[in-house]
Amino acid sequence: MDVDIGCYFEEKRYDDKLLDFIRYDVKTPKKTKYILQRPTATDEESVRLQRFYQLGVDLKLKYSKRRSLKKQGRIKNATEELLRLANEQLKLFNRIVERETNWIIYPLWVMAKQLIRLANESSELNKDSIEECGRTIHRSFTICLNDRNPRLNENKKIGCYMFANLEFSIYHRLSNKDMIKNLVKVLESRVNARDIPPLNKSLAMEHKSQVVLYNYYLGQYYGCLENDHERGFFHLNEALLQCPMLYVESTGKFVLQGQMEKIMILLVPLALLTKRLYPHWDHPVIAGVITRSKRLSQVYPTLVRSVISGNLSLYEATAASHERFFLSQGLHVVITLLREVVFTRLVQRCWQWGNDRKSIMPLKILLATKQHDSSANEDEEEQLDALECRLASAIASGLLRAYLSHSNRCIVFSKKEPFPHSK
């Protein structure tokens, strides 16, 4: 069966056969033959389409040869050549897309996605090669962003978020925080100006994984880079709620999307910090994530337990032993701020159980717990001074409603909600 690539451009549509032609790693069925016949096209369009067709054929051929080279241990050069061809194909397709309507957005995204996959396959690729891929994908993004087609049902702006996700991926690979920040600012300014549709009215809504991914990247940006923890929590929570899952009745378990682990790694500490929300480890969905993730199972149950119990020594031990992990995830600031939450919880427990909820509590009651970090060489007065400083910090940050009496060495709690953020 002949499949004419030119017909798709004549009819302004795509199907799985066109997508399979674009995907270099999809083998062409024996009874299928891709051809190009488009006699009505102008000379310039014909040249571009012919080149696009030839690049598609070359990529499939190069990929099949790459598989044999992989067995011989000569994979590096083959990968670089495949990446070069894929980048050239996307550059050319960008020029074709400029004159098309939004029917072509998804085929363009498939092409850009496979370029990123190629770039991520090899850890040996130099920075320049990855940046070149990023520039080509950015061109795809700007074509969508700046489309001036007055017919909204044909406008390519609906594809902005899907290409933004690809750009986020590249910038994270390059550890380029400035480019991430610029991309977020561009998108938000355009949304606020009503120049592009919001996420829930974009093409991403037809591909829910893209909605999950976009909210994940925004949650990571606000929660870990901008330290806007409330906003970070909001986007990560949205990402989690949109994650697809499948319940397998025969096993009684949930099959979860892999992205959920990444979301939970950021969401759990942000939920503890901003909302005092604790995960229910016995919930079947959360249990499924924990079972699959060594990082989650080894770190977070202990961290959550330290916050709930107000156990400062357990918190300090957890933060110290997993410091490298928290740094790699951009969570160092969040975990540091959690220390005040743990301390406040400790104060609350002393107020509840050691002081019978009286409004005035001597500081010696709190000091007697010996769970705050103090030096063995410090005398009691020095320890009380250090404790007052910590309490003053908690009061100033709004974690406690109280005031300190230095002369009486006590803390006086508000009679109405002395612990406003406790759960």
Curated annotation (Swiss-Prot):
GO terms classed as biological process: adaptation of signaling pathway by response to pheromone involved in conjugation with cellular fusion; cellular response to pheromone; conjugation with cellular fusion; mRNA splicing, via spliceosome; regulation of protein neddylation
Residue ranges annotated for the PCI domain, each copy included: 232-418
Keywords from the named record: Cytoplasm, Nucleus, Signalosome, Transcription
Subcellular location: Cytoplasm; Nucleus
S-S bridge residues: none
Membrane-crossing residue ranges in chain numbering: none
GO molecular function, one term: RNA binding
Extent of the signal sequence: none
Pfam families named in the record: PCI (PF01399)
Function: Component of the COP9 signalosome (CSN) complex that acts as an regulator of the ubiquitin (Ubl) conjugation pathway by mediating the deneddylation of the cullin subunit of SCF-type E3 ubiquitin-protein ligase complexes. The CSN complex is involved in the regulation of the mating pheromone response. CSN12 forms a complex with THP3 that is recruited to transcribed genes and required for transcription elongation.
Miscellaneous note of the record: Present with 1510 molecules/cell in log phase SD medium.
Assigned protein family: Belongs to the CSN12 family.
SUBUNIT field: Component of a COP9 signalosome-like (CSN) complex, composed of RRI1/CSN5, CSN9, RRI2/CSN10, PCI8/CSN11, CSN12 and CSI1. In the complex, it probably interacts directly with RRI1/CSN5, CSN9, RRI2/CSN10 and CSI1. Interacts with SEM1 and THP3.
Protein name: Cop9 signalosome complex subunit 12
Organismal lineage: Eukaryota, Fungi, Dikarya, Ascomycota, Saccharomycotina
Gene this chain is encoded by: CSN12
